[in-house]
Amino acid sequence: MLKKIPNILTIGRIIIVPFFVIAFYLPGFYGDLTAFALFVIASFTDFLDGMLARMMGEESKLGELLDPIADKIIVAAALILLVMSGTIKHYEVIAAIIILTREILISGLREFLAKGQIKLPVSNLAKLKTFLQMFAISLLLTGETGNKILNFQDYNAQTIGIILLWLSAFLTLYTGYEYLRKGIDHAISEDEKN
């Protein structure tokens, strides 16, 4: 199982996390650049591992288990670091909490449904949410370096990142509600059978 390329990419994404955390605390340009690069690599492998698994016919139970865990670890680490550093602050923290809460709830829901052999397929809207979330976090990780490079009048990398974070938080609420509704419908139908 570990020899399968998609699984190696997924495990690599988990291994990146401690290096990402260390890079986040490196000062200045190189710290910003390294943390940004590691997060972008992790985000890209999230897209790549699933695509390769389907293309190569290498979908596996291990990949199915580890992929969502790897996603949540890197996103949670990034959001927590961005809040702790003050990059995400004040009311913006609500967006981060919405994203983290949804991830925990949906993980629990998927586990519950898996017991009944029910899978929740990922919707296109959820894929868009993930893309916006990763893009927002990537921009926020660029720090002052990103603000100097990406600056359109009143909109710099941080401002655009916060706007995209809120947009992904709203999509998070919507897609989370959709998944929760499907899960509740399934639970009710199972109760009625018994």
Give the positions of each predicted feature:
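Core segments of transmembrane alpha-helices
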Residues: 12-17, 70-79, 106-107, 129-141
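Membrane-embedded alpha-helical segments that form the functional core of polytopic membrane enzymes
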Residues: 16-65, 78-98, 156-171
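Residue-level signal for threonine
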Residues: 10, 60, 123
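C-terminal membrane-associated helical module and adjoining short loops/tails
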Residues: 1-7, 17, 27, 35-43, ...
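Residue-level signature of the transmembrane alpha-helical core
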Residues: 14, 37-40, 69, 97-100, ...
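Membrane-water interface of transmembrane alpha-helices
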Residues: 104-112
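Active-site His/Glu-centered metal-binding helix of metallohydrolases
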Residues: 15, 44-52, 69, 73, ...
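Hydrophobic alpha-helical transmembrane segments of integral membrane proteins
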Residues: 2-3, 11-15, 64-67
